[in-house]
Amino acid sequence: MSASTAAPARDRLRIAIQKNGRLAEPARSLLAACGLSWRQSRDKLFCYGESLPVDLLLVRDDDIPGLIADGVCDLGIVGQNELDEQASARRRAGLPAAYHAVRGVGFGQCRLMLAVPEEWGWQGVAQLAGKRIATSYPAILADWLERQGIDASVVELSGSVEIAPRLGTADLICDLVSSGATLAANQLKPVELVMESEAVLAGAVREPADARAALLAMLLRRMDGVLKLRDSKLLMFRAEQGNVDALRRLLPDADPLVQLPDDGNGALRLQTMCHGAVTWQRLEELERAGAQGLMVLTVERSLA
């Protein structure tokens, strides 16, 4: 289907995610936390939504932007780097991207970086002039080189980019880096950041106007609730009125304290949502400041 052809009307939402790879399991877990469940087809590429009319398509990550642009899928979970690469390539071909990042989903963080052989004495981007750079992200790299005013050759490779300098097919590389272990194993060192990336929920620029619109709104609301609470804990405790201000100062990353009905013991019953780590040391600080009966509870979902 071409980007200019209207997608047929349908009443089920369709989401594309990576079949295998580092984003596959976190993406499925996030969607499951939003209340979705599926029945998998025999070919294991299509998952029929059982709890809601929301189906999954399991594909290669580099297929996801095109599936959204062509109206085959409504949403996809994919790396921002892949989204930007294909958007840039489409612009260079005179085509609209037709999709955008709706929101980050809190996993898959990495960096697209230039890496050079360890023996290089790196002095800055001017050193790239006339060099050959191997990458799986030629459009992003070409855009970056243009912004830097550097004339260098882009060598496109679909995989094993890190061995290109050793094979003599490139002088340096531009590749995704998370821990840096792969670079070190190939006697390379990162020297220049091209872009920061993370997994995002991507969607079509033109949102569906049929029955899928309500499903989309509901799913996004649920996802917001899950993402907001992912690293949050509900903290409950009792305290005397005179200690409340000191306790509040120890909770800078928490929501405003909420007072619960009195339990007849004289102390205030309080609760708050903490959006940072609630460690033993932190609980002990709160106890020394006058908090009593401290409880830390996990919250799985919320509708704000």
Curated annotation (Swiss-Prot):
The gene is hisG. It comes from Xanthomonas campestris pv. campestris (strain ATCC 33913 / DSM 3586 / NCPPB 528 / LMG 568 / P 25). Its cofactor is Mg(2+). Keywords: Amino-acid biosynthesis, ATP-binding, Cytoplasm, Glycosyltransferase, Histidine biosynthesis, Magnesium, Metal-binding, Nucleotide-binding, Transferase. GO terms for cellular component: cytoplasm. It catalyses: 1-(5-phospho-beta-D-ribosyl)-ATP + diphosphate = 5-phospho-alpha-D-ribose 1-diphosphate + ATP. Pathway: Amino-acid biosynthesis; L-histidine biosynthesis; L-histidine from 5-phospho-alpha-D-ribose 1-diphosphate: step 1/9. Feedback inhibited by histidine. Catalyzes the condensation of ATP and 5-phosphoribose 1-diphosphate to form N'-(5'-phosphoribosyl)-ATP (PR-ATP). Has a crucial role in the pathway because the rate of histidine biosynthesis seems to be controlled primarily by regulation of HisG enzymatic activity. Its EC number is 2.4.2.17. HAMAP family: HisG_Long. This is ATP phosphoribosyltransferase. One of its GO terms (molecular function) is ATP phosphoribosyltransferase activity. GO terms for biological process: L-histidine biosynthetic process. It is found in: Cytoplasm.
